[in-house]
């Protein structure tokens, strides 16, 4: 399951954990940020937001034995 581009809350308000539970049947999750979007980059704390989301995806996948790939530049220095 590809979860990219994943929007920031100023684009769409959604619950990442609920989405992960819905796709827990899969054997692989690909997660990535919304790139090249002025709207996503305008979200205050977008780097922190994506770092937190990536951490949640990694933890969920490890707990459920799901392979995962976090796209390049999703995890960044804050």
Question: What do these predicted regions represent?
Answer:
Residues 8:
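Short acidic loop-to-helix transition motifs that present clustered carboxylates
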Residues 11-78:
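Auxiliary Fe-S-binding modules of radical SAM enzymes
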């Amino acid at each position: 399951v590809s979860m990219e581009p994943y929007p920031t809350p100023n684009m769409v308000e959604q619950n990442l954990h609920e989405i992960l539970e819905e796709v827990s049947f899969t054997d692989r999750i690909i997660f990535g940020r919304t790139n090249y979007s002025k709207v996503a980059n305008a979200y205050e704390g977008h780097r922190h937001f994506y770092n937190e989301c990536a951490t949640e995806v990694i933890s969920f996948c490890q707990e459920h034995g799901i392979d995962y790939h976090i796209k390049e530049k999703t995890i960044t220095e804050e």
